[in-house]
């Protein structure tokens, strides 16, 4: 279900403050965040944001094509290694 157009996109306040602070200084430092639910907005373009995937922070460079998506979409939390080759023990 999509978000209502009457509401603004969700961006965590601490993340928005950090981005605005870096934009006023015209710096491009790494921003570390746990907020995977935040929506990417146009002021984030050009920044590198390290998004937590449950184990570590993955640095993601924000481009204009990412605007409107959530930060968590670009940091996968699961890595599927494939099914077991010989699974005879569990077949019984």
From Swiss-Prot:
Location relative to the cell: Plastid, Chloroplast
Pfam name, any one: Ribosomal_S19
PROSITE patterns in UniProt: RIBOSOMAL_S19
Coarse class of the protein's main subcellular location: plastid
Protein name, as recorded: Small ribosomal subunit protein uS19c
Transmembrane segments: none
Keywords annotated in UniProt: Chloroplast, Plastid, Ribonucleoprotein, Ribosomal protein, RNA-binding, rRNA-binding
Family matches, as SUPFAM superfamilies: Ribosomal protein S19
GO molecular function: rRNA binding; structural constituent of ribosome
InterPro entries named in the record: Ribosomal_uS19 (IPR002222), Ribosomal_uS19_bac-type (IPR005732), Ribosomal_uS19_CS (IPR020934), Ribosomal_uS19_SF (IPR023575)
């Amino acid at each position: 279900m999509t978000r209502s157009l009457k509401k603004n996109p969700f961006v965590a306040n601490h993340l928005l403050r950090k981005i605005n602070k870096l934009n006023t200084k015209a710096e491009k430092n790494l921003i570390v965040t746990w907020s995977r639910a935040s929506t990417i907005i146009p002021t984030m373009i050009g920044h590198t944001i390290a998004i937590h995937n449950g184990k570590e922070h993955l640095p993601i460079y924000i481009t204009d094509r990412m605007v409107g998506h959530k930060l968590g979409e670009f940091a996968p939390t699961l890595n599927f290694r494939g099914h077991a080759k010989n699974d005879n023990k569990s077949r019984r």
